[in-house]
UniProtKB/Swiss-Prot annotation:
Its EC number is 1.5.1.38. Coiled coil: none annotated. InterPro entries: Flavoprotein-like_sf (IPR029039), FMN_Rdtase-like_dom (IPR005025), NAD(P)H-dep_FMN_reductase (IPR051814), NADPH-dep_FMN_reduc_SsuE (IPR020048). Keywords: Flavoprotein, FMN, NADP, Oxidoreductase. It is an enzyme of class 1 (oxidoreductase). GO terms for biological process: alkanesulfonate catabolic process. It comes from Pseudomonas putida (strain ATCC 47054 / DSM 6125 / CFBP 8728 / NCIMB 11950 / KT2440). This is FMN reductase (NADPH). It comes from the Bacteria.
Length: 197
């Protein structure tokens, strides 16, 4: 099982990044392969000039194509997800998320930003033809404390429980996901079916 996780924060230190890292650890503890991409790791020119021929972008596209599911984590700015994340998602082909399960995660300054996932991020994921976009998780800034020195980042207990519940739902959805049939195999099956009638 392969999951691609995408961090939408341009900052090195971000609460959405903390949740993404916790999610990666949880999935890897259950034997899931997780590959993480951060928008800040892509050359700015590749994103701003939509360089589909960039090796970084092509590598990203290939892994998304191979993935069973995605976790997309973003801070919410001015009632929407990060613009840097939008530029990265714009580099995916039209049906890039077909046959994939997606778990959105967002963080914001207050609970007032919670609807940004439903009204801003989910429509973009739907336009990319995500097979199933799960309910997702929203955390306000007071629920995530950054790591300090040797002390790891902390989540309030209610958020920790919501995150684990959502990851469990995501993991189960990945396991029950129907596998798409390769076009060549499908063609062979159709020809065989005609002969057997």
């Amino acid at each position: 099982m392969l999951v691609v996780s995408i961090g939408g924060s341009p900052s090195l230190r971000s609460r959405s990044g903390v949740l993404l890292e916790r999610s990666r650890q949880w999935l890897q503890d259950r034997g899931v392969e997780v590959v993480t991409f951060q928008v800040r790791d892509f050359p700015a020119e590749d994103l701003l000039h939509a360089r589909f021929d960039s090796p970084h972008v092509q590598h990203f596209q290939q892994l998304v194509a191979q993935a069973d599911g995605l976790i997309v984590s973003t801070p919410v700015y001015k009632a929407s997800f990060s613009g840097a994340l939008k530029t990265l998602l714009d580099l995916l082909p039209e049906r890039a998320l077909a046959h994939k399960i997606v778990l959105p995660i967002a963080t914001g300054g207050s609970i007032a930003h919670m609807l940004a996932v439903d009204y801003a991020l989910k429509p973009v994921l739907s336009a990319l033809k995500a097979q199933e976009t799960l309910q997702g998780i929203f955390a306000d800034d007071s629920q995530v404390a950054y790591a300090e020195g040797t002390k790891p980042a902390q989540l309030v207990q209610a958020l920790e429980e919501r995150l684990h519940d959502s990851l469990e739902t995501f993991h189960v959805a990945l396991a029950r996901r129907p596998r798409p049939v390769a076009p060549g195999v499908l063609n062979e099956r159709l020809i065989s079916a005609r002969w057997s009638i």
